[in-house]
């Protein structure tokens, strides 16, 4: 199995269940984030895109992209564990970088958990660096507060 066997394409509604399952297998789901809401928001927002990697009809990877005009963001970068180290993640990130560049956004950033050392290493191998920005948060609804 390698990246040549996979095709990157736009997310389609028929992918929804398989995509959520992929995110689950990859450990990306959190109780306070409804993945269906995240998908809906992405596909209905003009400054975002959801791309998937498909091999013979099987969803094996994803990347959710967005930008605010100053920086592009990568969320839900996922590669099924059976496909790790086959170039799928690199292909998704190359796509993400081109997408951000085509939108004339000067910088791309990725979101990941600080303790996810394998993923942090992956990004470093692609030339990404830790930055000195500290993210703060505040939950604005009870559902999120009670689930965190």
Located regions from the model:
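Generic C-terminal helix-cap and adjacent flexible tail
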Residues: 2-3, 140-148
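Acetyl-CoA-dependent GNAT
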Residues: 6, 10-76, 80, 95, ...
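Residue-level recognition of specific faces of alpha-helices
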Residues: 73-76, 111, 122
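A short, internal acetyl-CoA/4′-phosphopantetheine-binding micro-motif in the GNAT/acyltransferase core
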Residues: 77-84, 112-113
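Conserved acetyl-CoA-binding loop-helix of GNAT-fold acetyltransferases
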Residues: 85-98, 125
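Conserved GNAT acetyl-CoA-binding A-motif
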Residues: 100-112
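Conserved beta-strand-loop-alpha-helix junction that forms the acyl-donor binding cleft
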Residues: 110-119, 137-141
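Short acidic, glycine/proline-enriched helix-loop-strand junctions
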Residues: 118-130
